[in-house]
Regions:
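Short, Lys/Arg-enriched N-terminal segments with co-localized hydrophobic residues
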Residues: 22-43
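Active-site pocket-lining/capping segments in soluble small-molecule metabolic enzymes
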Residues: 41-165, 184, 192-291, 298-310
Length: 310
């Protein structure tokens, strides 16, 4: 169920889509996520970017309509959402032109861990992104990072959370290598984020504020490979962690084999709760973050626009 509060009139075009989506419950709260970001950002004399997912052109347009400052998208290959519709090359050009016409930004994911068979094909795609005018390439693999530097030296690089950026020295190293932005690991605390900002003040920092969590550090899980032969680091994760499991611990001589139960007779050891940081957005911004990211390129338009509006 979508829950939000809007100050706009029903006839206001900027909220027209809201009232075409049901069910809708209006509640009494001070402001939406977008308004909260801008209000806090204004007090700090800086604009904090709201970065939204877009799995296709329709999702891109509605994300911008609902207040996103930038969108991240994937091409037909080389990204971690292989099961999404994504953007064909011609659609990427259309998407970039559309976003730029509205004064917004668009980042393209190149965040697979590349194998040898892909290295020869990446340069052409990278050059195309630079030619089209993409605002950045999101990269996780060190080899792909170097390819972007060589074949599109003016294309900004954002280092993906898949690179497991958990400390200030890693962030500084990426910055020294030429990265414009580093996307921190989801497992970071506010204190750690503040330390990174203090130690590396001259690089953009991006964090996830909403969406799915991985049971392991991003990219370090092999459940999908093991159970379904689908590589999570190549965009086809089966999300096996969300299956129902009965976990049994063995090897305890005093107790023997026994079920592992957390609550209500179930265990959630393989499935982290989804991330929702709305109550901490002000603290995240105060920690020095430049961009707040919503996960969900494969989610529905309804889900994505709800998360940007709540």
């Amino acid at each position: 169920m979508l829950i939000w509060k809007t100050k706009n009139n029903k006839n206001d075009k900027s909220r027209k889509i809201c009232y075409n989506i049901k069910p809708v419950v209006i509640i009494n709260c001070d402001y939406t996520i977008t308004e909260k970001i801008y209000k806090i950002g204004g007090l700090m004399q800086k604009r904090v970017e709201l970065l939204a997912p877009a799995g296709n052109m329709e999702k891109l347009k509605t994300a911008i309509h609902f207040g996103a400052d930038a969108c991240f998208v994937g091409g037909s290959s080389f990204n971690l959402r292989g099961m999404s519709s994504n953007f064909k090359n011609k659609e990427l050009k259309e998407a970039i032109d559309y976003v730029h016409s509205l004064g917004k930004k668009i980042y393209v994911t190149l965040n697979i861990f590349a194998h040898n068979t892909e290295i020869d094909y990446l340069p052409r795609f990278i050059k195309m992104l630079a030619e089209y005018g993409a605002d950045a390439a999101i990269v996780a693999d060190l080899g792909v990072f170097q390819l972007v530097r060589e074949h599109a030296p003016n294309l900004p690089i954002h280092v993906s959370t898949q690179a497991n950026n958990t400390n200030w020295m890693s962030v500084k190293t990426w910055k020294d290598m030429g990265a414009k932005r580093v996307i921190l690991a989801r497992e970071m605390s506010l204190k750690e984020i503040k330390t990174i900002r203090e130690k590396v003040p001259d690089v953009e920092i991006e964090v996830f504020i909403h969406g799915a969590m991985c049971m392991a550090y991003s990219g370090r899980c092999l459940l999908s490979n093991y159970f379904t032969n689908r590589d999570s680091n190549r965009g086809i994760c089966a999300q096996d962690c969300r299956w129902n499991y009965k976990v049994i611990a063995e090897g305890h001589e005093d107790k023997g084999a026994h079920d592992i139960v957390e609550e209500h007779g179930e265990t959630f050891i393989f499935n982290a709760k989804d991330l929702c940081s709305i109550e901490f957005i002000d603290q995240i911004i105060e920690a020095g973050v430049n961009s707040l990211k919503i996960e969900g390129r494969m989610k529905s338009i309804y889900y994505n626009n709800s998360s940007k509006t709540i």
